[in-house]
Every structure is written in C-alpha cells, then in structure tokens.
Curated annotation (Swiss-Prot):
GO terms for molecular function: DNA binding; DNA-binding transcription factor activity. This is HTH-type transcriptional regulator YidZ. It comes from Salmonella typhi. Keywords: DNA-binding, Transcription, Transcription regulation. InterPro entries: LysR-type_TF, LysR_subst-bd, Tscrpt_reg_HTH_LysR, Tscrpt_reg_YidZ, WH-like_DNA-bd_sf, WH_DNA-bd_sf, YidZ_PBP2. Residues 25-44 bind DNA. The gene is yidZ.
Length: 319
C-alpha cells in the first residue's frame, strides 16, 4: 500500500541526504549538530519506511544499497528545490550562505581577491570555501559538496578529460580557451638557442600531477611524433611548477597555460614564455577549454546563477 508523505518526518530526508553525502553516521551527525545516536535512530526509521537497509557497513564506511543509489538524484533534487523555496520570499540578504568552489590554481588565485569582494559585498555574512581541483572534484559536485568547479579540460581525441566525456548530470560553460606555453627562467641557456622541438626536449621538464596522472595531452602529442620529454620533477600544480622554473641554479622548464602570465606578473616571477614548438594541427590537440562546471540540479539556483555570472565577468576582465 502506498504510504502518505504526511506520515513521514521530513527531517528524516535531510538526514538521509547527509548520510549519502558523508557515508558516515558520525559525520552526518556533526553536520546536523546532533548525536550519532540520534542519526542512528533516524536511519532505523528510514529503513522501516523504505523497507530496505539503505546502507550497509563496510571498512570504508557506509555503502548505499541499490535502492538508495536509485533515489540519490531524486533526493538531491528535492532538497535543492526546498532550499530554493526557502530562499525566495525574503528580500533580506540570506544569513550564513556558503559558497564552496573547486578551482584550478593559479586560475583562482588571479581572480579570488576580486571574486571574494563581490561575494561579501552581496552577501556580507557569507562564508567561502575553496579547494584545489582534483581527481574527485566532479564527484564532489555531484554529491553536493562543491557548488561550482572551474578548471581546464583537454582537447586531445584520446584524452579522458574531454568535455564530451563529462557525466550527464554535469552542466558546463566554456569561459575561454587557452594554449599551454613553455616557461623558462630569464637566463635559461635555451633562450640562446634556436627555439625548436630539439631544444624543447633537450632540457629537463617540470610536470604536474593532474587528476592522479603525471602525463597529459602534451605527452600524447609527443608520443605520436615518436618523441618523449624527460620529466625530472612532478609537482601538485601550475603555481609550484612556475615557482620552481623561476629559481636559479638549474635548467628545468615548465609548461603551463598562457593565462599564467597574469600570475607571473602578480608575483613578479623572472620567467620568459615561449610557444610550444608544434604545428597548428598539433597545437589544436593541446587547446585547453577552461570551463565552469555545476550540477544540473543547480542550473536555476539563484546563488549558483549569480556566482557563474560573477566569475564570467571577472574572466573577461582579468584573463
């Protein structure tokens, strides 16, 4: 027999969503500001309502049952609609509004000061949490832990980071496209040589570990040419690679998006940029579309719509 929604405590659905996000009774309790015992009792009521275990204990935490997995999207959409309804009628600035972003650095570092000022001007009591874009950031967007992501994707046909391979639940907007350039310290010996592929490959390279991979489209293009670069140093992000490339006493070179010239100017790094020594077809495979990413359930969320517009405007002005 179909059960009536009027007989269900709707707070239980909030508990269910947090359990799905955290996969932990203790962590869900912390977010709800209640005891783990209270969350366990709520879970027992939910299990009785749905006549399903919903979660099973594993060494890695709570694992959702097939029924729980099938309900995840509907539950998240329902909670999002509830949040939007609560935000609508008030002509006051919402209190305690949180902005959670995952962004490639130094992209965010270039614009974060201006972006944070805009956020606080509009929402004086807002809190902002920024994390580096990483291999699990898309999942964080899907699970509601991140409002919006801002990062580069890839264009190489064999890349796993193509925009066309994004999950169906993710919406996106390409704000600008950029090519990687080569960055060398001002007195690098390569600057006294003919700038060609042989010179580019003669010196040791700094690479970044991107989404748990030490190689990217640049290495795929080189492989197609039967060539390979010597990666002497791997670092977590572009800002570290640029900082190291600018240091004296070595001949390391870095490859990073051209927009990084703004970051270098901001921090007065003594670096010189050179284009990658490839032809037009090869460079096309290296084009990086820098993309805003958010979950489809947030496409009409006023907070996310405003944030997208703010980032878009800043990109046109700063990048």
């Amino acid at each position: 027999m179909k059960k009536s929604l009027t007989s269900l405590d709707l707070n239980l659905l909030l508990c269910l969503q947090l359990l799905m996000q955290e996969r932990s009774v203790t962590k869900a309790a912390k977010r709800m500001n209640v005891t783990p015992s209270a969350v366990s009792k709520s879970l027992a009521k939910l299990r009785a309502w749905f006549d399903d275990p919903l979660f099973v204990n594993t060494p890695l935490g709570l694992a959702p049952t097939p029924l729980m997995v099938s309900m995840e999207q509907s539950l998240a959409d329902w909670m999002q609609m509830g949040n939007q309804l609560l935000d609508k009628p008030h002509h006051q600035t919402p209190r305690g509004l949180k902005f959670e972003l995952a962004a490639e650095s130094p992209l965010m570092m270039i614009m974060f000061n201006s972006l944070s000022q805009q956020i606080y001007q509009r929402y004086p009591q807002a809190t902002i949490k920024v994390r580096n874009w990483d291999y699990d950031s898309l999942e964080a967007i899907t699970r509601g832990k991140v409002d919006i992501g801002f990062t580069g994707r890839e264009s190489h046909p064999r890349s796993r980071e193509l925009i066309s391979l994004l999950p169906l639940a993710i919406d996106f907007e390409v704000l600008f496209s950029d090519l990687p350039w080569v960055w060398l310290q001002e007195d690098h010996p390569a600057l006294r040589e003919a700038w060609d592929l042989d010179t580019f490959l003669r010196y040791p390279h700094i690479s970044i570990c991107w989404e748990q991979s030490d190689t990217w489209a640049l290495d795929d293009v080189l492989q197609e040419m039967g060539r390979k670069r010597h990666i002497a140093l791997s670092l977590p992000g572009f800002e570290q690679s640029l900082f190291m490339a600018a240091q004296p006493g070595h001949t390391l070179i870095a490859t990073a998006p051209r927009y990084c010239q703004h970051y270098n100017q901001l921090h007065q790094l003594p670096l010189v940029a050179r284009p990658l020594p490839f032809d037009a077809q090869q460079r096309e495979k290296l084009m990086v579309p820098f993309t805003l990413l958010w979950h489809k359930r947030n496409s009409h969320n006023p907070k996310i719509v405003w944030l997208r517009q703010a980032i878009n405007t800043l990109c046109r002005r700063l990048i």
